[in-house]
Structure formats: C-alpha cells, structure tokens
Amino acid sequence: MKNVYICHTNYHLLLSLIKLNIEDTNDIIIFDDIINVDRIIKNIKEYCPQVQIYIRKNNIYSKFKKISFKTNKVRKWLFEEIEYFKNFNNIYIFNDFTRVGVFFHQYKIIYNLIEDGYNYFSFVKSLSLKSLYLYIKKL
C-alpha cells in the first residue's frame, strides 16, 4: 500500500513516524514552517531510509483556488498535484482546516484524519424521500 502523511508541526511528524508501517511505501510531506526542518529530515533519512520525505511551502496551496481562471503553468501544476495524491491508497492529514485540507476538499481527494482532526468539511447529510424509503424497507 502507498501512504502519504502530511505534517505541519513536529507533533504531526512524530505521530506519522509512529503510525507508518515500514512494509508499506510511505511518503511524508513536511511543510516549511516546522523549526529545524533540515536537521529533522536528515535524522529521518538516517533511521528510516525507506521513507520518502518532501518539503512544501506552506503558502503554495493558497494561491490556486480554481483551475478555470489560471494560466497554463498553474493548471499544469494543479493537475500534477492532483495526480500525485490520487496515486496513494491512504492520505493522512491531521487537520483539514489547513490550506492542503481545503485543496483536498475542493478537488474531491479522499483523505483520512488522524487524531483529533477538526473534520472541518463534515456536514449533516439530509436524506431524500427515496433514500429514506429504501432505509425503512431494509428494516
């Protein structure tokens, strides 16, 4: 299985390292607002060489809200980013109120919340009359 863990803090990174299964293919995306990120990456590569680590700038997802009105360069980046994440079996994030969480929600990329993720985009789904009828019929 292919997993990706998206970390914004040292705590997220620690939990990701605890949670990951060494037998799986694992990527960790670390955002640049983590303190001493270079030293941390060096240590992870030393002790877990099979884990791929990528650094992303925290503000990169805020610039691109919709594909429709973007330049070809931005559209290409968005397409590559969406395809990158769709290649994973599991995407793990800690809070979906972050820019990357909004990105996943906007482009309908399925993700898993770890720990006490806010589940910012959850909502109560109202039942239509037909689905209510089918639900009652099952009983």
Task: Specify the residue positions occupied by each region the protein language model found.
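Active-site and donor-binding regions of nucleotide-sugar-utilizing enzymes
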Residues: 4-138
